Amino acid sequence: MSAVITPADFNDYKVADISLAAWGRRETIIAESEMPALMGLRRKYASEQPLKGAKILGCIHMTIQTAVLIETLVALGAEVRWSSCNIFSTQDQAAASIAAAGIPVFAWKGETEEEYEWCLEQTILKDGQPWDANMILDDGGDLTELLHKKYPQVLDRVHGVTEETTTGVHRLLDMLAKGELKIPAINVNDSVTKSKNDNKYGCRHSLNDAIKRGTDHLLSGKQALVIGYGDVGKGSAQSLRQEGMIVKVSEVDPICAMQACMDGFELVSPFIDGINDGTEASIDKALLGKIDLIVTTTGNVNVCDANMLKALKKRAVVCNIGHFDNEIDTAFMRKNWAWEEVKPQVHKIHRTGAGSFDPQNDDYLILLAEGRLVNLGNATGHPSRIMDGSFANQVLAQIFLFGQKYADLSPAQKAERLTVEVLPKKLDEEVALEMVRGFGGVVTQLTKQQADYIGVTVEGPFKPHAYRY
């Protein structure tokens, strides 16, 4: 898409500065050249228009790459309304370019919590009334939760939700277990072409970038503690190792802990003998007193708690690349310590009390992005080529769920299909193949004899569902 309209033609949006639209359009065109899977889906399904009639409520980081996703959904027939899932992650030029193309969007970098909630509401509402949406695309689950709690009537028309992140999937599974989930969901996060690309390789690229942009620190030779060794933790540990840091890992899952050891990282715990009893006495102060950088990667709560924050080395950098800001106990920091803004999304947290502070005080922590996603708060997130896999999965998931027409089923059929599932492996392989072609790679085709020998078809899928990549 290349059309840019004037603001007078369209006012169903709120962005920081609509005059940034041309800049956003130029960056979007470059991003398209780095997103071969997404652009391949545009070409493949252009005539079929599989999303014609789809009305999608979207809540995901409003970046340049997301602009390519949005315009792909529109190119395949959908109408959308959009907001960002994080108060710091919007690239204002991207939001402006989407608004200038006549697409409703409500997002700007540096929203307050109240403004964030307002943007979510505007995604749902058109002219003050709930839009007749029939699909949801979410990242983290805030939009899905708001619809269930405040606008349940909208869900009567909705065919399903596609969820981008680990945190959002956890929330969906919890709702399903409690009998609260009203619509089926596709777990995009656990598609291989999402989890291995976005969570692992994306973090490998974007974590060190964000820390260096935020602090201008040299990382080489310093000690880092990565909390969690799932796919995000794996990519994060690699990112810091690339910078020459001495990287330690903390993990609760024995399998992930084993992987950290096998990958050559020292497995440690911030707690003596690994036991957190909630007291300062349980903290391994000798360990934390040497840590220059701590990164949370888990999607869990208080994995860097108040007692850990008290024990960290003076002037240590603290950041999160998991999801919400509650991975770090920022609530404790706000209540008990003084905050000094160095620049947007970079704060010195003075551990000398909640009142005034001495600018020359050296007992402080450097907190990035207020504990929210550091790679989107202090930098621009993952590269386009990484997000290509994630967003191609989102498009295929939207097509898949929209085609299932859940809202039109009988109650008995709905009960049977009310699930949280991953995309079929064949679609995962379709995304991967488009990405490989984008790299100029050539995939070898099985012979009929070889396919028969391992019990698959020549066209795939090539691995059983339980295969761990």
UniProtKB/Swiss-Prot annotation:
Q: Name one GO molecular function term.
A: adenosylhomocysteinase activity
Q: In which pathway does it act?
A: Amino-acid biosynthesis; L-homocysteine biosynthesis; L-homocysteine from S-adenosyl-L-homocysteine: step 1/1
Please name the top-level EC class of this enzyme. hydrolase
Q: Which residues bind NAD(+)?
A: 165-167, 199, 228-233, 251, 300, 321-323, 375
Name-wise, this protein is: Adenosylhomocysteinase
Query: What organism is recorded for this protein?
Result: Pseudomonas fluorescens (strain Pf0-1)
Q: What is its EC number?
A: 3.13.2.1
Q: Which family does it belong to?
A: Belongs to the adenosylhomocysteinase family.
The record's PANTHER family line, in alphabetical order, gives: ADENOSYLHOMOCYSTEINASE (PTHR23420:SF0)
**Per the annotation, how and in what number is the cofactor bound?**
Binds 1 NAD(+) per subunit.
Q: TM segments?
A: none
State its location(s).
Answer: Cytoplasm
Q: Which UniProt keywords apply?
A: Cytoplasm, Hydrolase, NAD, One-carbon metabolism
Which chemical reaction does it catalyze?
S-adenosyl-L-homocysteine + H2O = L-homocysteine + adenosine
